[in-house]
Amino acid sequence: MRMEAGEAAPPAGAGGRAAGGWGKWVRLNVGGTVFLTTRQTLCREQKSFLSRLCQGEELQSDRDETGAYLIDRDPTYFGPILNFLRHGKLVLDKDMAEEGVLEEAEFYNIGPLIRIIKDRMEEKDYTVTQVPPKHVYRVLQCQEEELTQMVSTMSDGWRFEQLVNIGSSYNYGSEDQAEFLCVVSKELHSTPNGLSSESSRKTKSTEEQLEEQQQQEEEVEEVEVEQVQVEADAQEKAQSSQDPANLFSLPPLPPPPLPAGGSRPHPLRPEAELAVRASPRPLARPQSCHPCCYKPEAPGCEAPDHLQGLGVPI
């Protein structure tokens, strides 16, 4: 309650400590204007500056000659704050700025009031910056007998705007068919991206179709690449099997089995025998003109058949 001149006021000591405890009424001198309220109202928000002010002597504050607490703030915005603590609603005059009330609410640390004012300011900003609605217009040409049916069947947000009589273009016998131009409109609901909901849905569906088509093309390309790779591998294998140069690259044959009664033959023996068999016989020495000088030293010691006639001494 704001104290006005000529009004009856509680005793001067109502703002201070009375005998036996604190008084019920509290005076607040805000910027030269005295407000009178109850201690219960000020203690509505436990974490606020006003609640701490009237709960004890922890928060030191000066007082005037009447015992009212001195608060150096603007009294213009203190009235809505005090009313909010009384009934929990924010009531502002038309000429009162919400920014000023918000500044005072932050000073007094009244959390619920701060949130309410910020929400209201955001709503106003959104309303101011909101894009005005846009309309799409269509002009339909119809005959008189079709006009009633067309207007009655309009739906999906289309609205009749104007009807223009353009006379008759055709003459069938004695009766003329009057024709009209019917102007209809539809509101486009804007989205945060600046597109209407209908156009955004169409754009989205088109993008999805393009993505699906691109995915299908990529899958087809992968399958074709795999088929070409398989065909190339098969062709390469066929060519390598027909090339005689690749015969040497065949895997080695397994070793022959062990003989029935012994160990495995030495690997070099077959080659040695083959070399001996394949080696040419020694050339016969030319026959000397001298008679054979072979003379057996003892009877019965004759030269072998392949050495007879060669003149080789024994």
UniProtKB/Swiss-Prot annotation:
Keywords: Cilium biogenesis/degradation, Coiled coil, Cytoplasm, Disease variant, Dystonia, Ubl conjugation pathway. GO terms for molecular function: cullin family protein binding; identical protein binding; ubiquitin-like ligase-substrate adaptor activity. InterPro entries: BTB/POZ_dom (IPR000210), SKP1/BTB/POZ_sf (IPR011333), T1-type_BTB (IPR003131). Residues 24-94 form the BTB domain. Residues 208-225 have a biased composition (Acidic residues). GO terms for biological process: cell projection organization; endoplasmic reticulum calcium ion homeostasis; positive regulation of cilium assembly; proteasome-mediated ubiquitin-dependent protein catabolic process; protein homooligomerization. The keyword Coiled coil applies. Residues 190-268 are annotated as: Disordered. It holds the Pfam family BTB_2. The keyword Ligase does not apply. It is linked to Dystonia 26, myoclonic: A form of dystonia, a disorder defined by the presence of sustained involuntary muscle contraction, often leading to abnormal postures. DYT26 is an autosomal dominant, progressive disorder characterized by a combination of non-epileptic myoclonic jerks and dystonia. Affected individuals manifest myoclonic jerks in the upper limbs during the first or second decade of life, and later develop dystonia with predominant involvement of the craniocervical regions and sometimes the trunk and/or lower limbs. Homopentamer; forms a closed pentamer. Interacts with CUL3; interaction is direct and forms a 5:5 heterodecamer. Interacts with TCHP. Interacts with CUL3, as part of the BCR(KCTD17) E3 ubiquitin ligase complex, at least composed of CUL3, KCTD17 and RBX1. This is BTB/POZ domain-containing protein KCTD17. It comes from Homo sapiens (Human). The lineage of its organism: Eukaryota, Metazoa, Chordata, Craniata, Vertebrata.
